[in-house]
Amino acid sequence: IFMTTKSRHPETVALHGGNFRSDTTTNAVAVPIYQTTSYEFNSCEHASNLFALKELGNIYSRIMNPTNAVLEERVAALEGGMAAVALSSGQAASAFSIQNVARAGDNIVCSTDIYGGTWNLFNNTLRALGIDVRFADPSNPDNFKKLTDDKTRAYYAETLANPKLNVFPIEEVAEIGRKEGIPLIVDNTAAPLICKPFDYGAAVVIHSLTKWI
């Protein structure tokens, strides 16, 4: 999810966010479950434009699906984001967010107060891929700066740490990241109706949607 503006009440966005409007054939208000695999193209030129990303549209279900698209748009709208990508799990979102900014030889600085599954993902899987993970005590935001060097590609934290529920100093660490040119990635465990990390300087927001969807 990437930052943009928002204006509607969150309750309205939760119900009506995204580009879906009532079905013109059935007048159904709820978003249908589209069981898609592939899509029909209007012409060879249409297909060419879609694959060349010259115009928006559905290409293949492993890339996009109309039901997923509404979910992505709705979550992005709730967070005040430009766009979102739905993945298979919260752990996939955590890995995806890091692997988009870091590669072998790079490092990230992560809060010590995070979900155990994420700690294992970072401490074992990311390190096996060559991405060093440095853990910082968030009780002092300067700990993130102390662990930063020219190979640091991201800061990572949870809004409310799982399971301690201590509040992460988003604004302070985001400001350190801004000065260092490093994005702060936040797993918004608090849900956007309680906290919007973008409002406090986060660059990327991720979710495990089973927590609140």
Language-model regions, residue ranges each:
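Ligand/cofactor-recognition surfaces for anionic moieties
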Residues: 1
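Short, basic and Ser/Thr-rich N-terminal targeting/leader segments
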Residues: 28-29, 80, 129
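N-terminal "arm"/small-domain region of PLP-dependent enzymes with the aminotransferase-like
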Residues: 4-65, 73-74
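Conserved N-terminal alpha-helix of the aminotransferase class I/II PLP-enzyme fold
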Residues: 43-95, 117-125
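Conserved PLP-enzyme active-site core in the AAT-like
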Residues: 4-5, 16, 21-22, 83-213
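Glutamate identity and glutamate-enriched acidic tracts
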Residues: 11, 40, 45, 55, ...
